[in-house]
Design a protein with these regions (language model features):
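N-terminal "arm"/small-domain region of PLP-dependent enzymes with the aminotransferase-like
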Residues: 2-6, 10-76, 209
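Conserved PLP-anchoring active-site segment centered on the Schiff-base-forming lysine
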Residues: 123-143
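Active-site C-terminal subdomain of aminotransferase-like
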Residues: 207-210, 217, 222-327, 339-340
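Conserved PLP-binding catalytic core of the aspartate aminotransferase-like
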Residues: 302-312, 317-353, 361-363, 367-368, ...
């Protein structure tokens, strides 16, 4: 087989479809978020405004977080020197896990090197260890959840997105004595919609199923202490396992799962993606711990973000931009064509110093291409006006029509 030819063909097909991804080299500037320096191919840099960061609350540059990280590096060095089982567990890990368990009202928590790994480890392990397990997965679940379920080898049932009635139908078709897991998200990252957690728990509880809730795009952002949508809706006690990330609203890196102590012990003891990897660096755990503690006690960042989300959404819709009225902080601007989406992103960056990464297949379905806008507490009204004016200008230049979106 001509391996080189095969690989070249795959890349050329991606480029022809408008799906080829390029890296944009950015240098974040401490204390100046959401501004960053864009480094061009010629080595020159210029200042741009970032509108697609997952550092939702700017905690990646918060003084408390940075101070904790600097202190940890000075005291403990860079890495841990081992896995959690072999010399790689430290005080920062233990305190962070206790803080996360408290955040969600659970008995215990377990941290991982990323949110992707935490889903892979937890779902992959639990589904594998439960004999004849059936896993029920929302149709729009994240890739990490899909891969974890696939890796478990358990039989998978896909229920229509956010459709508790369809979930009930599927669960009724399975023998009641089989172990069952219902896996879903609270805030869906591409559409910005929110799951009916209580209704899904109603169905799961009726069948005696484990509920597994991914709160990656909600922790830190929702609830009186940043415990996510489940905390905000008062249903966290009904969810068996809550998974989250330390790399978005908390601004650092890593992932975690919180739940019953027995299940945490099972994952810790049987998940190869936990057992056989070096543990999270002490300064990352220390920074995440500072972020979690700050957001538990201080709602100011959340309040400012919500003000900005509402303000920008109103401005975009007043300009007839195709932004659905989502209930979350995520504002998808629907383009519906891969090439136009990519070119829109390029022109925003080239002509207006605004960076929003295009979202194309396979992250979203063909025909659902979009720009994913994430306002933060630190975007100003001037930033918003510049963004709306730039989008109006780019739309006029490219001639893309405004797709119909939900009111």
């Amino acid at each position: 087989m001509d391996h080189i030819g095969r690989f070249e063909l795959l890349i050329s097909e991606m480029k022809a479809d408008g799906r080829y991804r390029t890296f944009v080299e950015l240098e974040r500037m401490s204390g100046q978020f959401p501004a960053a320096l864009l480094r061009g191919r010629d080595g020159r840099s210029r200042r741009v405004t970032v509108w697609c960061s997952n550092d939702y609350l700017g905690m990646g540059q918060h003084p408390d977080v940075l101070a904790a990280m600097h202190d940890a590096i000075g005291r403990f060095g860079a890495g841990t020197g081992g896995t959690r089982n072999i010399s790689g567990t430290n005080r920062q890990h233990v305190e962070l896990e206790a803080e996360l368990a408290d955040l969600h009202g659970k008995e215990a928590a377990l941290i991982f090197t990323s949110g992707w790994i935490s889903n892979l480890a937890a779902l992959g392990t639990l589904g594998r260890l439960l004999p004849d397990c059936a896993i029920f997965s929302d149709a729009l679940n994240h890739n990490s959840m899909i891969e974890g379920i696939r890796r478990s080898g358990a039989e998978r049932f896909i229920f229509r997105h956010n459709d508790a009635a369809h979930l009930d139908q599927l669960m009724a078709s399975v023998a009641p004595e089989r172990p069952m897991i219902v896996a879903f998200e609270s805030v869906y990252s591409m559409d910005g919609d929110v799951a009916p957690i209580s209704a899904i728990c109603d169905v799961a509880e009726k069948r005696g199923a484990i509920t597994y809730l991914d709160e990656v795009h909600a922790v830190g952002l929702y609830g009186s202490r940043g415990g996510g949508i489940a905390e905000q809706q008062g249903v966290a006690h009904r969810v068996t396992l809550i998974e989250g990330t330390l790399a978005k609203a908390f601004g650092v890196m890593g992932g975690y799962v919180a739940g019953p102590a027995l299940l945490m012990d099972v994952i810790r003891s049987f998940a190869d993606s936990f057992i056989f990897t070096t543990s999270l660096c002490p300064h990352l755990a220390a920074g995440a711990l500072a972020a979690v503690r700050h957001l538990k006690a201080h709602p100011a960042e959340r309040a400012r973000q919500w003000e900005n989300v509402g303000r920008l959404k109103a401005m975009l819709r007043a300009a007839d931009m195709p932004v659905p009225d989502t209930p979350s902080h995520i504002l998808p601007l629907m383009i519906g064509d891969a090439h136009l989406c990519r070119r829109t992103s390029e022109l925003l960056l080239e002509d207006h110093d605004i960076y929003i990464q295009p979202i194309n297949y396979p992250t979203v379905a063909h025909g659902q291409e979009r720009l994913r806008i994430t306002p933060t507490p630190y975007h100003t009204e001037a930033h918003m006006r510049s963004l709306v004016d730039a989008l109006v200008a780019v739309r006029a230049r490219l001639g893309w029509s405004t797709p119909r979106v939900a009111a």
